[in-house]
């Protein structure tokens, strides 16, 4: 394969894995530990 093809596949996989990890952090089990600044400062 050409170098550009390997590089583009690597970048695509990297972006896909980062997106999956951020979605897991936002909506998965670790989201219970996230704080909500709007709930901390109710008027």
From Swiss-Prot:
One of its GO terms (cellular component) is chloroplast thylakoid membrane. Keywords: Chloroplast, Membrane, Plastid, Thylakoid, Transmembrane, Transmembrane helix. InterPro entries: PSII_PsbN. The chain crosses the membrane at residues 5-27. It is a single-pass membrane protein. It is found in: Plastid, Chloroplast thylakoid membrane. GO terms for biological process: photosynthesis. It comes from the Eukaryota. Belongs to the PsbN family. HAMAP family: PSII_PsbN (MF_00293). May play a role in photosystem I and II biogenesis. This is Protein PsbN. The gene is psbN.
